[in-house]
Amino acid sequence: MGPKLLESRLCLLLLLGLVLMLASCLGQTPSQKFAIQHINNNTNLQCNVEMMRINRARRTCKGLNTFLHTSFANAVGVCGNPSGLCSDKRSQNCHNSSSRVHITVCNITSRATNYTQCRYQSRRSLEYYTVACDPRTPQDSPMYPVVPVHLDGTF
């Protein structure tokens, strides 16, 4: 009885470890990645600081990134607007915002071998934006059935 109990506990421990390992491999959902890369309510953000955070996850310097100064909930609301053709000319899940928001565009000015050393310039403006939306994943909040997953452009 002793060896079987030890064996079953070991199997349970291995199974728990496997579940935890799989959960950590799942990483961010597409909507979480969208929020991290494009939603920032700070209209005075510093591109060098914010892009270092994004580049850390990528392990390389991103050349261009647009931050929308709005909430994730407002971006989700855009998913309720009529859908249309995305800039890739294939996808039909793009939605235009009905109001303009402040944006900051960070454009790389100095690319470095080490992603922490890249430098950016900022351009601020007030623009409409287009997001691609998909049904939420099981890891996303059930609060929103459809979520933004890609910033398709500004205009």
From Swiss-Prot:
<dbReference type="GO" id="GO:0005737">
    <property type="term" value="C:cytoplasm"/>
</dbReference>
<dbReference type="InterPro" id="IPR023411">
    <property type="entry name" value="RNaseA_AS"/>
</dbReference>
<dbReference type="InterPro" id="IPR036816">
    <property type="entry name" value="RNaseA-like_dom_sf"/>
</dbReference>
<feature type="glycosylation site" description="N-linked (GlcNAc...) asparagine">
    <location>
        <position position="107"/>
    </location>
</feature>
<dbReference type="GO" id="GO:0003676">
    <property type="term" value="F:nucleic acid binding"/>
</dbReference>
<protein>
    <recommendedName>
        <fullName>Eosinophil cationic protein 1</fullName>
        <ecNumber>3.1.27.-</ecNumber>
    </recommendedName>
</protein>
<feature type="signal peptide">
    <location>
        <begin position="1"/>
        <end position="25"/>
    </location>
</feature>
<feature type="binding site">
    <location>
        <position position="33"/>
    </location>
    <ligand>
        <name>substrate</name>
    </ligand>
</feature>
<keyword id="KW-0325">Glycoprotein</keyword>
<feature type="disulfide bond">
    <location>
        <begin position="61"/>
        <end position="118"/>
    </location>
</feature>
<feature type="active site" description="Proton donor">
    <location>
        <position position="150"/>
    </location>
</feature>
<feature type="glycosylation site" description="N-linked (GlcNAc...) asparagine">
    <location>
        <position position="114"/>
    </location>
</feature>
<feature type="disulfide bond">
    <location>
        <begin position="86"/>
        <end position="94"/>
    </location>
</feature>
<feature type="glycosylation site" description="N-linked (GlcNAc...) asparagine">
    <location>
        <position position="41"/>
    </location>
</feature>
<feature type="disulfide bond">
    <location>
        <begin position="79"/>
        <end position="133"/>
    </location>
</feature>
<dbReference type="InterPro" id="IPR023412">
    <property type="entry name" value="RNaseA_domain"/>
</dbReference>
<comment type="similarity">
    <text>Belongs to the pancreatic ribonuclease family.</text>
</comment>
<keyword id="KW-0540">Nuclease</keyword>
<feature type="disulfide bond">
    <location>
        <begin position="47"/>
        <end position="106"/>
    </location>
</feature>
<dbReference type="Pfam" id="PF00074">
    <property type="entry name" value="RnaseA"/>
</dbReference>
<dbReference type="GO" id="GO:0004519">
    <property type="term" value="F:endonuclease activity"/>
</dbReference>
<keyword id="KW-1015">Disulfide bond</keyword>
<feature type="binding site">
    <location>
        <begin position="62"/>
        <end position="66"/>
    </location>
    <ligand>
        <name>substrate</name>
    </ligand>
</feature>
<feature type="active site" description="Proton acceptor">
    <location>
        <position position="38"/>
    </location>
</feature>
<feature type="glycosylation site" description="N-linked (GlcNAc...) asparagine">
    <location>
        <position position="96"/>
    </location>
</feature>
<keyword id="KW-0378">Hydrolase</keyword>
<comment type="function">
    <text>Cytotoxin and helminthotoxin with ribonuclease activity. Possesses a wide variety of biological activities.</text>
</comment>
<keyword id="KW-0255">Endonuclease</keyword>
<keyword id="KW-0732">Signal</keyword>
<dbReference type="InterPro" id="IPR001427">
    <property type="entry name" value="RNaseA"/>
</dbReference>
